[in-house]
Curated annotation (Swiss-Prot):
This is Tryptophan--tRNA ligase. One of its GO terms (biological process) is tryptophanyl-tRNA aminoacylation. A motif ('KMSKS' region) lies at residues 202-206. Homodimer. Keywords: Aminoacyl-tRNA synthetase, ATP-binding, Cytoplasm, Ligase, Nucleotide-binding, Protein biosynthesis.
Length: 451
């Protein structure tokens, strides 16, 4: 069975050389591997959270689609579609919203960062916070779960959202008594190439130090390479290749043999002007054919639209049967005669508490104890590997709940093993609320022990 890998493409801004080397090129290369069903989508609904300029959103969709196609994405081999062309995504988003606890969304990093910024400014915590920003992780979960993606490659800043998608999928599966959703695996992109910008810092639009991918043509590329900051060593003086931004850029686009030859030239005293020209020529050799294709595509948006519509049709063939199944599961299926409905076996209500494990954004492993209604009752300390976390989950089930779970202070409680706190309960409003949560957590552990 093939592995489904899903990649979302944010449709804000114009791609630069760093985007290509760090995300576009490796994703396209990965899509050609045997045994992989690759899904790529333009996340234009997500773009509306960050941008309220319709012209910019529309232009960015065109540029991003043209860029990925020009860079070698094969729409015949992969499923390439636009998020807004798949109505099943928004329908699933609502079904998932109805089972997602608000407390889970309260912990999302983007939301918490906005609240912290507002606190620093002395304004209301939710000032300027839209429901789009607040519920963004649910839409992301719908993007992933609709196609039952097995793997989702992300940077560390997105790990939490993937873990939330797993949590939401588990809650839905548990509530409606079937494994409707595959739990997606977080694939952290550890080897993502980070290119230096014109000033040596990470290439980023935020630093205004980017090298254009296609924008400005060959002249724009040449102009950018000429503006790369170098040290003051003169022609004839040996250069330190490892400390050179020029060398790092050259190495990212050259073969090992080419890279070694360029390094030798720098160490033998090649002037910075000649080095910049060599970098430009090496980049242009790769980018010129892609740029030509990009210009053709940008000038023919109808062709891109046809490709995206074909991709949407392909995607919806997979999405529609699942959504029909989910509609039936939640009671939104077609009306049936009373006799037919009576003949159907009643779905067994899901009443069990459960542990769920997840990987934190720093790479450590944790687990949560959830009540039957999905409320979080415990969150563990971090562990170096999943076996440690799993062993402690099993031990907690074997311990007497009254001994394992004890009050931490007036408004919180913790799980104790071997004299150490290994997990913490949520902070309550007062001692009475804490006692109620503690009793609920003990009941959940007892239920797990009896299962």
């Amino acid at each position: 069975m093939n592995t489904r890998v899903l990649t979302g493409i944010t449709t804000t801004g114009t791609p630069h050389l760093g985007n290509y080397a760090g995300a576009i090129r490796p994703a396209i290369q990965a899509s050609t591997q045997p045994g992989v069903d690759a899904f790529f989508f333009l996340a234009d609904y997500h773009a509306l959270i960050k941008c309220d300029d319709p012209a910019r959103v529309a232009r960015s969709r065109l540029e991003l689609a043209a860029t990925w196609l020009a860079a070698g994405l094969d729409p015949e081999r992969v499923t390439f579609y636009r998020q807004s062309d798949i109505p099943e995504i928004t329908e699933l988003c609502w079904l998932l919203t109805c089972v997602t606890p608000k407390g889970l969304m309260n912990r999302a990093h983007a939301y918490k960062a906005s609240v912290d910024q507002n606190a620093a400014k002395g304004v209301e915590p939710d000032d300027g916070v839209t429901m789009g920003l607040f519920s963004y992780p649910v839409l992301m979960a719908a993007d992933i779960l609709l196609f039952n993606a097995n793997q989702v490659p992300v940077g560390r800043d997105q790990v939490q959202h993937l873990e939330m998608a797993r949590d939401i999928a588990q809650r839905f599966n548990h509530l409606y008594g079937r494994e409707f959703f595959v739990l997606p695996e977080v694939v952290i992109a550890e080897e993502v190439a980070t290119l230096p910008g014109l000033d040596g810092r990470k290439m980023s639009k935020s630093y205004n130090n980017t090298i254009p991918l296609f924008e400005g043509g060959a002249a724009g590329l040449r102009n950018a390479t000429q503006r790369i900051v170098t040290d003051s060593r003169l022609p004839g003086e040996p250069k330190d290749a490892e400390a050179s931004h020029l060398y790092m850029l050259y190495r990212a686009f050259s073969t090992q043999q080419e890279s070694m030859a360029f390094r030798r030239q720098l160490e033998e005293g090649m002037g910075w002007g000649d080095a910049k020209q060599a970098l430009y020529e090496r980049l242009e050799r790769d980018l010129a054919p892609m740029r030509e294709r990009y210009v053709e595509l940008i000038s023919n948006p109808g062709l891109i639209e046809d490709i995206l519509q074909a991709g949407a049709a392909k995607a919806r063939k997979l999405a529609q049967p699942l959504v029909r199944t989910l509609r039936d599961a939640v009671g939104l299926g077609a009306l049936q005669p009373a006799a037919a409905k009576a003949a159907q076996p009643a779905r067994k209500a899901a009443k069990d508490a459960r542990f769920v494990s997840f990987r934190d954004e720093d790479g450590s492993f944790r687990f949560r104890l959830l009540a039957a209604d999905g409320e979080e009752l415990l969150c563990s300390v971090p562990f170096a590997n999943p076996k440690e976390a799993g062993a402690l989950m099993r031990r907690l089930q074997d311990e007497a709940p009254e001994q394992a779970l004890r009050g931490h202070d007036d408004v919180s409680y913790a799980a104790w093993l071997d004299g150490k706190e290994v997990a913490y309960g949520p902070q309550a409003a007062d001692a009475g609320a804490r006692d109620a949560l503690l009793a609920k957590a003990r009941e959940a552990l007892a239920q797990l022990a009896a299962a």
